[in-house]
Regions:
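N-terminal interaction modules that seed assembly of large macromolecular complexes
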Residues: 15-48
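Short, charged early-sequence alpha-helical segments and their helix-coil boundaries
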Residues: 47-63
Length: 129
């Protein structure tokens, strides 16, 4: 595996090149399709930059909520979320469960940071934190 450039640097460089060098010359529907492609590259860049850390903190919060901290559990993040959903469906967990509401809120904010960082409501919430 090569150290430089990183996948994040590569996707950002391609997006910047398309945005700054190619977009001005493209018109009509192709300009729209190009903007969609650039947005997808920006999304991948954010995923590469932010997702690992947010997944790790989400898994830690889920482990605590599910009473698994300190245990040797090898479940994936999807497994932990499935266990959370099952706990909610079974009535074992609800919004009165300490930490659940904060976990759901933080998970939503972390996902918006990757998927929709320019979403007006997300930006407003960041200003209030």
């Amino acid at each position: 595996m090569q150290d430089e450039p990183t996948p994040t640097e590569l996707t950002k460089a391609v997006a910047d090149f398309l945005r700054n060098e190619i977009t001005p010359d493209i018109k009509g529907h192709n300009a729209f399709k190009l903007r969609v492609a650039i947005n997808m590259l920006d999304l991948v860049t954010r995923q590469l930059t932010l997702e690992h850390a947010s997944d790790a903190t989400e898994a830690a919060r889920l482990s605590q909520l599910l009473g698994l901290q300190g245990l040797d559990h090898r479940g994936s993040l999807a497994d932990l979320n499935r266990a959370l959903a099952d706990g909610i469906a079974d009535g074992k967990l609800d919004l009165q469960t300490p930490g659940l509401q904060a976990h759901l809120w933080q998970t939503t904010m972390d996902k918006l940071a990757v998927d929709q960082p320019n979403y007006a409501s997300y930006k407003r919430e960041l200003e209030q934190e």
